[in-house]
Every structure is written in structure tokens, then in C-alpha cells.
């Protein structure tokens, strides 16, 4: 698989490469490091929007991008969730729901691609992704990084909403596969 030299592919690669940096600064455990980690996560999350937008608008869609963009998204979200679970006592249930859905949907998407069925990303799924990224940004920063006492609680509430939407939006993939079971 050849990586075409184009901006969307570089943004996808950058999103993957920033993950260890986010984790590293998170474990430094001071307010400046937390702020930097949250900022890096926000920037990485924003690249998720721009890589797809630029690829479609300027006809720069590649096989690499189609394959690795969702992988980069899952790696970013999954690594941050695991990091938060280990270090900050974030509620496990919404985290596990999000992780389980992402793995299942990734498998279903691969299966659907084999049988030549495409399930478009819904607006609700885009809202789900935004809320996941927003909640995780808040939780990375947390009360320790911001000095805002209840910021962790706000992040957890948004994470629960994102988990609920995660389950709802995952259903469309199961529905598309139903006739193959």
C-alpha cells in the first residue's frame, strides 16, 4: 500500500504520532503538562475533521486514508480512555461501552466492505465523536490541570452522553449486517 503524499494522509499519521506525546505529558502530572496534553488531544481531534474534509473537497481520497483514518481515531480515543482509566479513576462503564462499540463497529465495517455494503456516517455519529473528543479533552485537563473543581464531573457526564450515543449509532452497523447473520 503506497502512501500518497498529501495533507490528509499526513494529518492521519500526525494523529497517530501524537498519541505517545499525549500519554507522556499526562503522566508528568502537573497543571502545565495536563494543559499541554489536553491541547494536543484537541489538536489531534481537530485533524480528524480536517483530514476527511480536505480529502473529499480536493479529491485526495486514498486507500491509505480510508484504511488508517478510522484506525487513527480508534487509537487516539482508545489510548486516552485506557490512560484515564488507569490514572484518574474515570468511570469504567462508559469507557468500556465506547471501547467495545468501537471494536465491534470496526469489525462490522470490515465485514460490510467485504460484502460491498457501505454504511454512511450519520450526523448523530458525528455528534457522538465530537462529544467523545470533548469529554476526553476535559478529562485529560481535569480539575488537576485547570483548577476548576467540578471539571471532572462535567467531563464524566459528557462521557456518559457520548457512551449512550455510541450505542445508538452502533446499532446502524448491526442493522446493516442483520441480513448476513
Swiss-Prot record:
Keyword Membrane: yes
Record EC number: 2.7.8.5
Cellular location(s): Cell membrane
Reaction catalyzed: a CDP-1,2-diacyl-sn-glycerol + sn-glycerol 3-phosphate = a 1,2-diacyl-sn-glycero-3-phospho-(1'-sn-glycero-3'-phosphate) + CMP + H(+)
UniProt membrane topology term: Multi-pass membrane protein
The keyword rRNA-binding appears for this protein: no
InterPro entries to which the protein is assigned, alphabetical: CDP-alcohol_PTase-I, CDP-OH_P_trans, CDP-OH_PTrfase_TM_dom, CDP_ALCOHOL_P_TRANSF_CS, Phosphatidylglycerol_P_synth
EC top class, as a word: transferase
Keywords from the UniProt entry: Cell membrane, Lipid biosynthesis, Lipid metabolism, Membrane, Phospholipid biosynthesis, Phospholipid metabolism, Transferase, Transmembrane, Transmembrane helix
Residues annotated as transmembrane: 8-28, 35-55, 64-84, 148-168
UniProt pathway: Phospholipid metabolism; phosphatidylglycerol biosynthesis; phosphatidylglycerol from CDP-diacylglycerol: step 1/2
PANTHER family per the UniProt record, alphabetical: CDP-DIACYLGLYCEROL--GLYCEROL-3-PHOSPHATE 3-PHOSPHATIDYLTRANSFERASE 1, CHLOROPLASTIC (PTHR14269:SF62), CDP-DIACYLGLYCEROL--GLYCEROL-3-PHOSPHATE 3-PHOSPHATIDYLTRANSFERASE-RELATED (PTHR14269)
Recorded family membership: Belongs to the CDP-alcohol phosphatidyltransferase class-I family.
Function: This protein catalyzes the committed step to the synthesis of the acidic phospholipids.
The name this protein goes by in its record: CDP-diacylglycerol--glycerol-3-phosphate 3-phosphatidyltransferase
Organism: Rickettsia conorii (strain ATCC VR-613 / Malish 7)
Gene behind this protein: pgsA
Amino acid at each position: 500500500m503506497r502512501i500518497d503524499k498529501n495533507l490528509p494522509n499526513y494529518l492521519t499519521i500526525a494523529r497517530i504520532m501524537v498519541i505517545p506525546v499525549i500519554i507522556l505529558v499526562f503522566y508528568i502530572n502537573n497543571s502545565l503538562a495536563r494543559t499541554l496534553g489536553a491541547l494536543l488531544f484537541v489538536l489531534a481531534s481537530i485533524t480528524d475533521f480536517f483530514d476527511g474534509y480536505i480529502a473529499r473537497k480536493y479529491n485526495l481520497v486514498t486507500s491509505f486514508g480510508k484504511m488508517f483514518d478510522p484506525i487513527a481515531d480508534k487509537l487516539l480515543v482508545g489510548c486516552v480512555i485506557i490512560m484515564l482509566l488507569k490514572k484518574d479513576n474515570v468511570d469504567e462503564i462508559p469507557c468500556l461501552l465506547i471501547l467495545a462499540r468501537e471494536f465491534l463497529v470496526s469489525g462490522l465495517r470490515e465485514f460490510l466492505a467485504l460484502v460491498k455494503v457501505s454504511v454512511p456516517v450519520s450526523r448523530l455519529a458525528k455528534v457522538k465523536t465530537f462529544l467523545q473528543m470533548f469529554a476526553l479533552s476535559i478529562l485529560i485537563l481535569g480539575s488537576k490541570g485547570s483548577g476548576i473543581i467540578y471539571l471532572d464531573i462535567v467531563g464524566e457526564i459528557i462521557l456518559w452522553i457520548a457512551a449512550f450515543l455510541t450505542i445508538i449509532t452502533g446499532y446502524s452497523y448491526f442493522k446493516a449486517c442483520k441480513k448476513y447473520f
